[in-house]
Amino acid sequence: MDPRGATELQMEMLHKHVPKELLDKVQICTSVPGKVPIDPNKVNILWQKNSYDQPNLLEFFGNKERHKEYDWYIFNSHWNYEKFRYFFNIPEDRSVVIKNGTSNFPKRKIYKKGDPVKLIHHCTPWRGLNVLLAAMQEIKDPNITLDVYSSTQVYGDAFKNANDDEFKPLYEQAKKLPNVNYIGYKPNEYILEHMTDYDMFVYPSVFEETFCASALEALASGVHVITNNFGALYETCAEWPVYVNYTENHRNMAHATASAIVTAASYLHEDFIQEHLDEQVKFYKRFYSWNKKAMEWQSFLKGAIDEKFKA
């Protein structure tokens, strides 16, 4: 299969929600400069979703003369823009932030006291699965279980074949834990369809996210989120999750995550958290729906096209 990570999924949504007559006038390259050739007859855009510290970006961004190759730079978060501005002095007057979006806003699950507490984790395995599995080993309540969809398959067959062996010990550890169900890769459509089967999305990240599509999918579905404040997570998730403070001491972070899970499980049935989750869904529907993102993109693209071809 071809890659279908957040970058590919957001590009699919862009083409679904933004008129073709606008997109035909621009050339959008995602994240890695040069992946798509520059077209002198179009507005050339680098849609940057990768982090500033990725080795394959240094050659381009470290050479300020090369910044002129693109007409515009679009970043998926203010956090990401600020990092590129700070480390590479990118052209500020040709940079825009348009965050990722979602179109999945299902009727959320209402948790009732005594129901099983179901957790979901559907991030790639190098982003914090080790910490989460350590946290699950501390949880003794048999009513709390975790389903893990973590896999390298999301980035395609070639990526999986080259990298998956590194993470097989983690998969095996997950399979052996009594309160963890290791499921592995499922298409994004499956994840979205089943998101409301879950009560919490738990993500103790050890990877600097520039956004976090997995968290957005959970938040928009009314799922309670437990995460940390590493990278752009606090921007994507705003004030809605339970935050565990990031630390390089993974043992401490696992312990704090386990405590947060147990505490959250104890209040999921309370009226205050039900109201909280209702408001959470409203927030993400208002600010992160693809109806809104399409408006942002169309406004930007019209201006960029007019500037280049009508000047």
What would you call each of these model-derived segments?
Residues 1-38:
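N-terminal pre-catalytic "stem/leader" segment of glycosyltransferase-like enzymes
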Residues 224-227, 234:
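Short hydrophobic beta-strand element within catalytic cores of glycosyltransferases
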Residues 111-128, 133-136, 146-147:
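Conserved donor-binding/catalytic core segment of Leloir-type glycosyltransferases
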Residues 160-186:
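Nucleotide-activated donor-binding/catalytic signature segment of Leloir-type glycosyltransferases, i.e.
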Residues 196-210, 223:
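Acidic donor-binding loop of glycosyltransferase active sites
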